[in-house]
Each structure stands twice: as C-alpha cells, then as structure tokens.
Amino acid sequence: IRDIGVTGVQTCALPIFTTNTTWTSNNTYLLQGQIYVKNGATLTIQPGTVIQGDKTVAGSGLFICQGSKIVANGTINQPIVFTSNQAPGSRALGDWGGVILMGKSNLNVAGGIGNIEGLAVSPDTQFGGGANPDTMDNSGILRYVRIEFPGYVYQPNKEINGLTLGAVGKGTTIDYIQVSFSNDDAYEWFGGTVDCRHLVSYRNLDDDFDTDNGFSGKVQFCLGVRDPQIADNPTVSTSEGFESDNDATGSAALPQTKAIFSNVTWIGPLRGTCPAAQGAIAAGFRRGARLRRNTALKIHNSILMDGMRGLHIDGTAAEGNATSGKLKFQNNIIAGFLNNYSLERNAGSTFNIWSFFTTNNNDSVSCSANILTLPYGTGGNYLNPDFRPVVGSLALSNSSFNDATLAAFTIQAPSTTATINYCQGATSM
C-alpha cells in the first residue's frame, strides 16, 4: 500500500498480499486492479472502513484466495463499505469488480476444482476442494458489509458479481450483507456449503440469488428489490429473483445443487398493487424464481411479488426433482404478477405445476396490495420503505418450519410491529 497524496486515502498498489494486513477506518482504500490475498494471509478490515474500486482499472476487485481469510466484521452503526471511487451521483453499475471468496468446499465440476470465470486459470483464481473437499472450510467473516456498484463483465456469461462465493465452506460467516447496483448478479454461489443470513439485493442488473455447481448451504432472511429500469439484456440473459442450476448443462453431477432458502421477500419491477405494469419495464425481466437444469433447490416461507412471472420449474430434470421431493417450494406466497402469470412450465410439458404448488401449502393472489406495508417507499421512490406485513396479510399465517430440511433454521414468527430493521440507512447513491 502506498500513499497517493490525498489525506486519508491509500491505494492497493501491489496485486498480492501474502502477510496478515489490517485496513483501518481512518483511511479510504482504493483497489486498483485485482487485489489478491493469498498464502494463508488474513486481511482484517475495521468497522466503518470504506474501500473503493477504481473505475479506470478494468475489473478492480478484492479476491480472497484459498486458505486465506477476510475478517470484515462491521456493525450496524459502522458498516464496512465497498463502493465506486466515482463521486456520489456519478457512480454506476459495474464501476468496479466486486468481492470474491474462494474456498475448499464441495464443487460438482470435473476434479472438484474450478476457477473464477473470466480470469486466467491459476492458483490465485482456483476454488473447490478437489477429491477431498473441506465442507467446514473457513474463508473468514463478512458481517455488516455493503457492496455497491460492482459487477464486471469480461465477456457474455463470464462476469464477477457483487459477492461471488466459490466453494466457500460452512466455517465462514456471511451475515448482514447488502449488494446494490451490481452490473450482474447480487450474490452467486458456485458450490460450497456456507450458510448465509440477512442478505439484501437492491436494484441489481441480473439475478438476485444465483446458485450453481452443488451449493448446499442454508440461507435465511433475504430481501430482493428490483428497479423497473434495471435488467439484463434479454439477448444475453434474463433477470430473475432466484436462478438455480445443478450445472451449466443440467447434468447429474454430484453433489447436487440443493441449497435451502427461507424467509425471503422478493419485490419485482411492477411497483403496483395489482398485476399491471406501472410504467415502462425493462425487457430483460422474467421470473421471481427460475429453477432449472436439474437443480434441487428448496424455497420455504417466502414472498415473490410484483414480477412478470412467478415460479418456473424449467425442464424435465427439475420437474422430476419436484415430483420426487428433492426440489421444494413450500409455504410461499406469489402475488401481483403480470396478467396473474404466477406459474410457468415449458411448452409440451405434462408436469402438473398447479398441483405441485397447491399441495405444498403455497398461495397465489392476483394483487399484492394486502401483503406488505410500503414495499416501494413513500411515493414509490424507495425512500423509507416498510417491508413488514400489513394487518391481515397472508404472510402472517402461511409459514411453517415443520419440514425436516428446516431443522437448523431460526423460527421467526411474522409480525406487523417488529422494530428491527437491518436495512435502514444502508443505501448510498
């Protein structure tokens, strides 16, 4: 690190950290290029520290290599903020790369080892435990961390996301994270076993929660909020709330993608109380949840509302997993989708998606007016939103934690009067 001549600002001039390092809150740190923490080093970041990605250096980002750790343990009043180095008001999606953690847990690719897409194949970009994965691998702590204006596209379908988790193990702590204005996904898991809680995805481009390559962690308490004008290019990709694949070809590779999500609220682009678009909607929006390519994802106790389409179980392999009970969608609410388009199956499919939906205690309503209090904020401008259920909401009575897969989850009774709001004040422009 060297002083760049601005009081309180330091830049990461060297691309590699191989010894334990601490970044302090009295400095602002500038990431110029791809910064790697490797050789077992630990990067500690104090609460309240600001780290900026340099827009002028392509794909600037922070990479925590296998065997190394990040300890970014912020607080609700002193979050750690990763953001663009552009002036407030001039920041944009994709100004810099993002935060990437690479672990040694499960990965269902050949040999059990992969590399971060878009980058040169090397030990620095490698993740996965190979033939002997460590499901309890520890890549450190991310707690009360904001990641703003990330998401670098190297080429179509080869991007780094706001937070990329490659085969990250269950010994890692991921809690109270917000990704905003990413130029790709907010969160993407490539394999791994890490459990995550309190994840916010705010006005990102592509998918909010993307799971691939055998991810099997438990994820609870999530919020996704979409901007009607921010969606992917539909000739390249479509924007989903959930997108889940076993792998890119839908193979039977093991371990299978079987992550469990509970208590997720996803608010789509329609911004309305009934299933009709409120103004122009970007062409790339598609579904609240697209479960495809042999995934066995499980979604419980969640709300999908105000989108173009609701749940799509895409392809015969995913349909078979739904029939067998490996793929689950239980005790959820789908509300306010365009033209009441709550459920989708592929052309020619004989899968009875309606029966699957109703027998698993899910509800579908055409209007979302009586679900949440003020999901789009005052006047629909995202200021001071209130995501609590309204009195009489289906969300107050539709949850259940009786399924065996939810045994380790926190049982949280829905409330109209809860006072804890970990999102408050957590968005910067």
Residue ranges and their predicted role:
Residues 1-12:
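Single conserved hydrophobic/aromatic residue that forms the stacking wall/gate
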Residues 13-43, 54-67, 74, 83-184, ...:
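Extracellular beta-rich repeat passengers
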Residues 78-79:
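Glycine-rich loop(s) and the adjacent beta-strand/alpha-helix scaffold that form part
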